[in-house]
Amino acid sequence: MNYFDLFNVVPAFDIDTALLAERYRELQRAVHPDKFANDTEQQKLLSVQRTAQVNDGYQTLKNPLRRAEHMLSLRGIELSHETTTLKDGAFLMQQMEWREALEDIQHNSDPQSSIDELYESFGEFESTLLTKLATLLISDESADALLAADQIRKLKFMAKLHDELARIEDGLLD
């Protein structure tokens, strides 16, 4: 299903999230199961299914990473259940450095400073990835779509690093 069509928004990486939220509320009002409480079982079931589609579409489009994946899936590139390994040597080296830094946090004399530095480093890197991704998603070239897929893979890795750093930070606060 094309969620951009469902929400009647222009297919783009940078979307108007306020407009998306407005369309979400409109669609929810139109298909909400309570509206069909006195209808046939088939209509009730259809309403539940449509509500699920609207909810899934909204969650997909409001999240930049999921939105980018959806854009690629509309072009025939599925990333949701893949196990493709990145072949970017520089990124792999950076991953190793970040992993080592995460492991060293608990042994640092000022762990919060290390955490703050990593958040900043992650943020800068993610910003660069998102800028590249936005540019690649504009292109109609299939090679650019494959490069966009690599950017998404990197961003997924960064999300995992963020989660791990947050867990470490929470553990230090306990």
UniProtKB/Swiss-Prot annotation:
What are the protein's UniProt keywords? Chaperone
Any one GO CC term of this protein is:
iron-sulfur cluster transfer complex
* Molecular function, one GO term: ATPase activator activity
Q: Which InterPro entries did the record assign?
A: DnaJ_domain, HscB, HscB_C_sf, HscB_oligo_C, J_dom_sf
Every copy of the J domain together lies at 2-74
Q: Which PANTHER family match?
A: IRON-SULFUR CLUSTER CO-CHAPERONE PROTEIN HSCB
Its subunit composition reads: Interacts with HscA and stimulates its ATPase activity.
Query: This chain belongs to which protein, by name?
Result: Co-chaperone protein HscB homolog
